[in-house]
């Protein structure tokens, strides 16, 4: 090769000049191109993967959305079905609880009115032997055993002057005669009444007879009601019935008494309860009387006494108030040994260590006057469809819910059950409970008591148990003064103060004097209307209210034992007054 075509290097190396340089550039470019292509492919692959992932996610989201949409549609369909079912159920509930009872009541009232017309106009109807049916005037039927006030608003009241009407209660007819212990029951169709007629002053353990009557409410020409007596029975058969309670039942009256010829304190000292009598008196002059031995009586009770106040006919059962002395080692005595109820008046509390007050409250159930037996309240419950075989039981409330046993009354108003208990023990205020029974076909029935806190006034008492005492102690005091609730009681806060009731109290903390008609709220008296002269001696009172639905007038009959200076120690007087509510 020619020398001019070569370069001589210092290290003796030889390199071809032009062609060698072009080959190296091509190789570098090719490498860069390959790297670029690979990078583009890698980026493309990454983009494909990302895009594919996003597509998959979108597809999955769409599927989930479709599923959720499907579920939502199904829920909406179910909700529509449920709403439809709820609507039907609401219609059924309204029909059963509101419409149907109103229709039944309307049909019943129409039937009663029709029967009254038939019996009045057709003298030959065999079922109407007296030509006067045992049915109250239609003006009063819908206003009996109903709450006069249905709301919880604040109201004002006034008690009118006593209305002049013939008394449906006879008095004693001799200076040493005595009529005592009234018991009155007003039902939708008729009323029943009884009292004891004691032959030797007012010593009821000696010899007595029992007066029983039934009748209806009628309207007088003056526009106000009258208690018209249709039947009278005078039980004078040598039995010394005591503390009788009355109840209206279909076509007549039921009466629960006990028979004893010894002092009350001696009954508690014994070990076997006195004879219990259940008497059924019907409008057709039929009388059926049976000696009963309710389940739970023998072996548990030293004595059992009717509550004096009226009983009720409820859900095909007769329910009477009762109380008595429990044997200490009996099943009932052992079960209730540590039970006690200690209410507190927040406006006038009793001071002292709570444990000490609890012990004193427990001891109050065991007064020495009654041989230190636990004095216990109870209810006599008899199945009406088995009344002729006297299938009765004693239902005993817990003493954790009630004070010491005492006389009482069972009320049925607007299908709600209430129980008045006389304040015989240390608690000085009116005692009223809402009650509910659980009846069983087999086994022991039960009752739940819910105390209504009343602090408005106190009945008279004696010694350490005067109306001013608010601390637990052993007492046998007080007097029977049952109230009539005008409104339903509510446990909701803020409206309880508008619970109203009426009755006749004795306006003294220590003496049975000054009978006074009243209307009261829970914590204060709204109206006071004294009856008779200042210092008039009085005793038991029982009150019943009803409404004339023809003109919406409200009437109350206050039956009171009042002192008599002419015939006997007491005269039982029914005082009828009109109650105005604004």
UniProtKB/Swiss-Prot annotation:
Keyword Membrane in annotation: yes
Question: What GO terms in the biological process aspect are recorded for it?
Answer: symbiont entry into host cell; virion attachment to host cell
Molecular function per GO:
exo-alpha-sialidase activity; host cell surface receptor binding
Site residues (Binding to the host receptor), renumbered to this chain: 422
Residues on the membrane's Intravirion side span 1-34
Cystine links in this protein are 178-202, 192-253, 244-257, 350-471, 382-392, 465-475, 545-556
Q: What name does the UniProt record give this protein?
A: Hemagglutinin-neuraminidase
Q: What is the native source organism of this protein?
A: Mumps virus (strain SBL-1)
